[in-house]
Amino acid sequence: MEIVTVFGASGRMGQAQVRQLLLAGYQVRAITRKKGVFSDNNVTEVSADYNDPQSLDDALAGSDAAFYNKPSFEQVTKMIDFCAAVGAAAARADIRLIYQTAAYAPDEEIGQYNYDRVLATERALKQGGARTTIFRPVLFMDNTLTKW
């Protein structure tokens, strides 16, 4: 059975991803600070620290793919550093694909901070070298189906 690691698994997007991965028959490794969120036998809860490359390596070891739900910070340099750390760890783990859901942004910088920082985090994730897919929805559809 293929293993998919989900960063931020206990958050809104992460929980939806875990549910769909389980329905599709994957083994899920849930990176979360909240233990006990998942009761399914096909979910393994683990911790990882974005400041600790070894913990990221351990979290991704043996995974076939990963969903990266990046944390949000006011300090954009911290967010960029964390994206770079995850991208590098994914490459070291030989992950086939790392998938990130991001906010909408144009494909080129436009001099607008909120959009340009989205592109900066995407570049940081990709620079690790693992094959990366970025999805930029205008609206997270799960928000229309559940209370938030």
Positions of PLM-derived features:
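Oxidoreductase cofactor-interface core, primarily capturing Rossmann-like NAD(P)-dependent enzymes
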Residues: 1-34, 38-41, 51-54, 58-61, ...
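Cofactor-binding loops of NAD(P)H-dependent oxidoreductases
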Residues: 48
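Redox-cofactor binding/interface segments in oxidoreductases and associated redox assembly factors
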Residues: 65-69, 99
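Hydrophobic/aromatic pocket-lining and membrane-interface residues
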Residues: 66, 86, 125
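Glycine-rich anion/phosphate-binding loops
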Residues: 76-82
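Short, conserved SAM-binding segment of the class I
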Residues: 82-89
